């Protein structure tokens, strides 16, 4: 019986585990894994193809080749299972044990593991406190190392050459011991007392002051503590036994023609065994030391190559001069085990084919070719055939299917019914790249796809292919149906907009049908209902665009909500509309008013329409509505018959004159340049400006001419109406093309760029209708070619960014409903340059309020803290003019391993509060990565056209209200009575009658204020003006000018104006000054009062000093009298170097990698008063004195622009030296909220420029992951080391434990890690190793004996479990709860049994309660 049961033992449930630990294996551990020692380098006998005994494929060690058959054939078949054959020594068992049984090689001499030696920082070096070079010299037998100095003056671990060694031996005899090779290193490692070392290091860390030492000790301490904690002995880094991989994992495959294909590992193992055997023999023969040493070195090298080929010295090569693939190469990189096999598996039950359009499908359907369906659903069909009794065996069923008998097709129809399939289009950039559909069987070989889902898949029908996958199990089908069905995914997860928006033909049809024309056929008629309109239209009595009056029945929501009352009631009203709109009103879902259709439907409008439908009528009605819109759009587009011809491209009549005028202006500039009035650069900039303006003007003229057409109205008068020109309609509706493209067809092509990004100053004045000449065509080719090259580069870069983002966020999942925090971030409307870039409603929609939202007028609470702000809420808030709302964000969430639903808010792809289990991290990464390919790659050179457009010279109010200045605004009144601004960061606000901020404008230094604080103004009033071309240097005090260090030819040069003959002094660039002395001085002005004394800053002993920057034109003379507010010098903005602005993808990557910009601006470290100390060579010294009187110094390069002045009070984190901000400084000085605002706004700027909408919360989620580690400042009583970086949740858990035990918790600083760094420093070594730098990650983890708790998604995919997100999260929770209850039940039963029957150590107890 037992033997019978043994048969069923085969199918074991794989073991359930919750964590994976990695460590170093001790020699004994390796021997315990092994099934025998591999003694010979032979593989198989090439005549018999049987493995050699004791060789690399030995059947005795690794198991039989055929199932249940020993090698010599004495025992065959199942009945001998488990017998060990006495002839060949092979155990009779399954052949697949050859995949899991390991062997070993006993090394004749120990060998260092190359990973722990060469993977930087060298772990061996850290433990031994020796340099890598020294250890290498010892290991590779170039030097001796002292192991035990005995009574000699030598030091332990001292390195000596062979010569030294022999001299010392002569001197001291065998007083001391020195060794070579791995034996020596092993001895040293064994002699280390880790506990003792850790103690001394900790005390030294406390006592030392030097930065470098602290760093060095902390590193070493970390490694030693890791050994101490993990219980791994350091000498295990030296191998005495080498494990041998099971043979099936390094197969030897016979090719035809008697040759073999072999895995490189076999070669590497053969070398090790050969050298090892040779060394054994040499040792037995007592060969000379030098020969043995050489052999040992070769063995070390052979093992190095096996473990990580090419890590040290030249890589071992095979017969074909190709480096052999070692164990390390097997797991790392794109083709390694992690990314190729564990994260990138192939899928069974799948097919792929070309897609074609399926306009007759419903949104949730796809057309599946019959042949493909037959193949995909084969197993189901077999089953049905057997159940129905058509076929008795699988073989018969197979035959039926192959012959494609009629019964098979009937069964296929039945099997496929309500069995969804998943369609995927590569590249899958976001979750809408895979959606489920119900298959509809079709003839032909192409898959039919519904047109509305194309936007989500980013698919078109120019030959795209898609893959089909079949969910097999019932659970999989259910999830596909409820979560992935196309009709359940109608919103983009990136921004919550509808994804099923019509495009192209559909838009054109709807637009054409909803346009109105003057004096169309049947204008002015009235109809009693829509059916009458349709009849009139079908009888050609009216045209689609004619204006008519129609009685329209709308279904409106019933006010009466009592039981049994209908949800919608009809309401009839008369509308002035057009025939087309009236006909379309038929398909409106109940609950939407006709007014949403009563306008020309352009693409944006249709999107808004579908969005409104979704919010008001729910998912189901929206899907039906979208489908009907599509059907109508296609039908109407066909009826419209819109086509284009050359005559539709109307070239504007004014083009000739506009271009002629421009050419004249350019000639004039050339003349000025020839006579030396303007520089070459200025001429070029001006020419480029003229042509870009001309191009605009021609384009504008063209659009004006194209967009309207003359028409005779009903009264017989001529009037103009919006044009029915085909090209104009296509662009206007958003169906195809844009104003820019039309400009190229009918305006002028304009300026072209060279491949390096600079603009060619000769424009293409022709357009495509007129045709290009050869030169113009040639210039055009530049752009086209660069476009293609850019696209390829962009795709790769964008993919890499997405990969890094996914990796850093993959373990962020919503794990609870509410973390209960009251923290949040104050959200305001985003205003730039006085314009609202993003309204408050868009920023808070779908968020949870962190504190009560209060009506500013009545002070009543509108929405309590914890309320989800939906569309109605944000409309209320906007209507009441509330301009700041505190909302919960992912950054302030206090959930430890994950996020809570309240802090995240609405799930944008579903339109309701996010569910527990949603993998919000991955969604965020996809939302940011997916539009990456739309971003530009280039860095913009600001200069010429681009900067000209951006120069403003005044600022005016856009709304009525009161002017308010911010605290940092300072100004002086000059002799003319004008107010001149002298603050660098002043801003003017405009507030409305209740004091709410409506606009905010930056007022630059040197501007003249036209309105003062508190002034009531009307919209359009100018607030301030300034000179856009120069930046002034202004004095705040009056007096007599006294120059210092202003020497002609040294620090300044005289420039004489060619035209006017006037001379000015210009400050020379530091780098161009001749003498060393001149480089360190700074030209400046002091002021003298009437008595000739220096004017002091009021309230201080400091004299007023006003420095001149490089390039400043000094406008005052030495000894001149100046008044307050007078200009001393001007800096032409042209002479400021054109800063390259990194835009597009590189900018996004730069922000997420948290790179510090070069020439970053400097922020004030403390709050205090500014003063200037003694200048050093080339640097000026800025001192901030804080409130306690401590001084903080900054050294600033002289050419930098200082934004503060003597005596100014600055706040901590305020910018004091101009330059791009450094995110690390923002975090350190202004905190997490300011950092998050900075990163979110900067990333959004890049995407907004390309017109891409991404919700802020996705960026916040990534910032949260970048902040997930903290740096320990004071370790208290915790197990951390000061300066160590640890996971935030780990730190908080540890601190909670300390507080519970009444010990001192640790203090810490927040640190910002770039996404790559953050991915690599994650606590999960499996996830980090599969991302980048596999060797380093695994080495580190092995030494620390790290344990991976499998919290993230990636680790679980790799080990092949359900991921802890979505339904998987619930599954794991339930499984853990069951294990817990099982354990408790087991304990309880055990306790009861002990109580009743007694245990060996104690007799049973008497029942305490008396029997009842």
UniProtKB/Swiss-Prot annotation:
The keyword Magnesium applies. GO terms for molecular function: DNA binding; DNA-directed RNA polymerase activity; magnesium ion binding; zinc ion binding. Binds 1 Mg(2+) ion per subunit. Its EC number is 2.7.7.6. SUPFAM superfamilies: beta and beta-prime subunits of DNA dependent RNA-polymerase. Residues 1393-1412 are annotated as: Disordered. GO terms for biological process: DNA-templated transcription. Its cofactor is Mg(2+); Zn(2+). The keyword Transcription applies. Zn(2+) 2 binds at residues 819, 893, 900, 903. GO terms for cellular component: DNA-directed RNA polymerase complex. It catalyses: RNA(n) + a ribonucleoside 5'-triphosphate = RNA(n+1) + diphosphate. Keywords: DNA-directed RNA polymerase, Magnesium, Metal-binding, Nucleotidyltransferase, Transcription, Transferase, Zinc. Pfam families: RNA_pol_Rpb1_1, RNA_pol_Rpb1_2, RNA_pol_Rpb1_3, RNA_pol_Rpb1_4, RNA_pol_Rpb1_5. Zn(2+) 1 binds at residues 70, 72, 85, 88. It is an enzyme of class 2 (transferase). Mg(2+) binds at residues 460, 462, 464. The RNAP catalytic core consists of 2 alpha, 1 beta, 1 beta' and 1 omega subunit. When a sigma factor is associated with the core the holoenzyme is formed, which can initiate transcription. DNA-dependent RNA polymerase catalyzes the transcription of DNA into RNA using the four ribonucleoside triphosphates as substrates. Belongs to the RNA polymerase beta' chain family. This is DNA-directed RNA polymerase subunit beta'. It comes from Burkholderia mallei (strain ATCC 23344).
